[in-house]
Amino acid sequence: MPEMVDSNSTPSSSTGSRTVLLLLRVLTFVFLLIALILIAIVKQTDDETGVEIKFNDIYAYRYMISTIIIGFAYNLLQMALSIFTVVSGNRVLSGDGGYLFDFFGDKIISYLLISGSAAGFGVTVELGRGVPSNSFMDKANASASLLLIAFLFTAVASTFTSFALPKKD
């Protein structure tokens, strides 16, 4: 005689993947927030001239903060949609359009995040040549590192959204 399985005892794979996706979005949100705070507070005063240098004085750091803000806004929207989906069991954006929005949105945002991280790393290396390590470079490098980690979480989330795409024959 077949065994009866209680369907309420373990979550379905769909619920499990939605929860994992929400967790990835929360982690991305946290890392983007910390990266944003770090790059926004970074400043250095030149000992010789007394000129204060901030992130907005360097184009690559401006680009980096722009990618953080865009990623932050997108991720905030996706977190809200994910929370609604996990709590209610229904998607806000139903049909193929919602899945395509998730899929392409995650792809585009992940590419933006990695390009922002690369720009931050690149300019930090260039500016740091021949200069002893300082707080400005260390904080900017830490922000680029956190942005890289946020990219990794978004890339993994992108994999989950690609699995959710409706199968077309």
Swiss-Prot record:
Asked whether the UniProt record includes DNA-binding among its keywords, one would answer no
Subcellular locations according to the entry = Cell membrane
* Bilayer-spanning residue ranges: 22-42, 67-87, 108-128, 146-166
List the ranges whose topology is Extracellular. Answer: 43-66, 129-145
GO CC terms of this entry: plasma membrane
Q: Which residues lie on this side of the membrane: Cytoplasmic?
A: 1-21, 88-107, 167-169
Principal localisation: membrane
One of its Pfam families is CASP_dom
Entry-listed glycosylation sites = 141
Query: Per UniProt, which keywords does this protein have?
Result: Cell membrane, Glycoprotein, Membrane, Transmembrane, Transmembrane helix
| UniProt topology in membrane | Multi-pass membrane protein
Q: Which family does it belong to?
A: Belongs to the Casparian strip membrane proteins (CASP) family.
- Describe the protein's quaternary organization and the partners it interacts with: Homodimer and heterodimers.
Protein name stated in the entry: CASP-like protein 4D1
